[in-house]
């Protein structure tokens, strides 16, 4: 079906779409209640902060996203992975409204934005004939994460009683 390099590119795309989940709403929503309780904010306030941070991250994606054409894809992927790692750490330290906005901005930008963008651009770049099939397999990573991560995270949070 796919040759050696092609398989590696598809696995790369699958992994990047899987881990884009850390910036997706279905994952971040797991922490909604605990964040609102910690910061004493309403659903509406949280939603406004979330929407604003998402909009700002998408605006930045317009500028940063084009850099993938100027930088070696391996190096670009490392930068994106490091940014997502930092974003997850930063998200775990939310202690104020400003931190909340910044953390959501970083998670949405690095996770939902850059991880997805890197996966799609890389797979699209390597495939011409079977691009649709390759992208479908790549995006199965997100579907897998939507099934696995919420259950796993709720289980892990129950172990530490959060």
Where are these predicted regions, by residue range?
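Residue-level signature of mid-helix packing/kink "hotspots" within the transmembrane helices
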Residues: 54-62, 146-147
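Juxtamembrane helix-start elements in MFS-like secondary transporters
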Residues: 41-50, 135
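Glycine-rich segments within core transmembrane alpha-helices of 12-TM secondary carriers
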Residues: 130-150
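Conserved small/polar residues in nucleotide/adenosyl-binding loops
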Residues: 160-162
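Extracytoplasmic
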Residues: 9-43, 61-64, 149-153
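Conserved MFS/SLC helix-loop-helix module at the cytosolic interface between two early adjacent transmembrane helices
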Residues: 59-97
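Intracellular juxtamembrane helix-capping segments at the cytosolic ends
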Residues: 113-127
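Hydrophobic core of transmembrane alpha-helices in multi-pass small-molecule transporters
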Residues: 18, 98-114
């Amino acid at each position: 079906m796919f040759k050696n390099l092609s398989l590696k590119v598809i696995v790369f795309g699958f992994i990047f779409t899987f881990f884009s989940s850390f910036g997706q709403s279905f994952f971040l929503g797991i922490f909604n209640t605990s964040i609102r309780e910690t910061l004493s904010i309403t659903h509406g306030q949280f939603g406004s902060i979330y929407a604003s941070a998402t909009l700002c991250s998408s605006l930045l994606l317009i500028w940063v996203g084009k850099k993938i054409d100027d930088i070696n894809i391996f190096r670009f992927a490392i930068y994106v992975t490091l940014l997502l790692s930092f974003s997850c750490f930063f998200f775990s330290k939310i202690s104020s409204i400003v931190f909340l906005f910044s953390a959501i901005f970083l998670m949405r930008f690095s996770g939902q934005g850059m991880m997805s963008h890197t996966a799609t651009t890389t797979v699209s770049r390597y495939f011409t004939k079977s691009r649709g099939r390759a992208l479908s397999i790549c995006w199965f990573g997100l579907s897998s994460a939507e099934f696995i991560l919420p259950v796993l995270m709720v289980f892990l949070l129950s172990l530490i009683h959060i």
